């Protein structure tokens, strides 16, 4: 019949070929490569920190000397003033140009070997109060945590920016805490101490110091802060 003729004349439609499925942009191989890159960067950063720490320890082993009686008396008076019963080890060290607090679980205070020749008793007391305030605020532990974060998140510029800004805030907070109890004359003495220490070169990176930055704008900012009305009472301002 007509139906049979129509069926015989109707073109046979062949099935369309299956479209190729899109290839994934992010494959297991690329994920493995990124993980390997992250681990390599983390290992490199950790190695750099360990190298710096070992270099500091070697320098301390060969260049540290006991402090003199004058410095020790001023240090004892500062500890008593700040209510610090457990005194940190205090050593003089050649090769550094600013008082500094080492970073880690067992901190110690390092003083330049010629500090008694460059600072007055009042200026030396200001410098020691600053480092002891770092210790009271546990800044050495915060600094250790920041270093660990830069190991894990070495690829993230926000972490590095946060570390830089927190370090600035740690110094500003210490300045504020030390100068809060000082009168105008004593604050000027503290500012003169900052300027005297900022004029020296900086070569040590594994410590927290009163004037370890070599930037003039940091010196100006902190000297202005000494005479500012705002006093930060928090250990550090968070971004």
What positions do the PLM features span?
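Glycine-rich phosphate-binding loop
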Residues: 1
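Membrane-embedded and juxtamembrane structural elements of multi-pass membrane proteins
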Residues: 4-8, 20-239
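Intrinsically disordered, low-complexity proline-rich regions
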Residues: 10-16
């Amino acid at each position: 019949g007509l139906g049979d003729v129509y069926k015989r004349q109707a073109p046979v439609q062949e099935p369309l070929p299956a479209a190729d499925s899109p290839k994934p942009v992010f494959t297991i191989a690329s994920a493995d490569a990124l993980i390997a890159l992250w681990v390599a960067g983390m290992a490199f950063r950790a190695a750099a920190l360990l190298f710096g720490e070992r270099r500091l320890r070697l320098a301390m082993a060969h260049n540290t000397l006991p402090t003199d009686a004058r410095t020790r008396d001023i240090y004892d008076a500062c500890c008593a003033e700040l209510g610090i019963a457990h005194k940190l080890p205090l050593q003089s060290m050649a090769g550094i140009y600013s008082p500094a607090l080492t970073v880690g679980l067992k901190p110690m205070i390092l003083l330049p070997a010629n500090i008694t020749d460059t600072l007055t008793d009042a200026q030396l007391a200001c410098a020691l109060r600053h480092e002891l305030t770092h210790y009271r605020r546990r800044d050495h532990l915060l600094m250790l945590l920041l270093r660990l974060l830069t190991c894990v998140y070495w690829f993230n510029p926000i972490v590095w920016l946060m570390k830089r800004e927190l370090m600035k805030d740690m110094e500003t907070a210490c300045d504020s805490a030390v100068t809060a109890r000082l009168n105008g004359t004593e604050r000027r003495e503290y500012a003169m101490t900052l300027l005297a220490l900022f004029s020296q070169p900086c070569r040590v990176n594994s410590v927290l110091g009163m004037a370890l930055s070599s930037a003039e704008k940091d010196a100006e900012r902190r000297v202005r802060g000494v005479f500012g009305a705002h006093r930060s009472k928090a250990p550090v301002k968070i971004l």
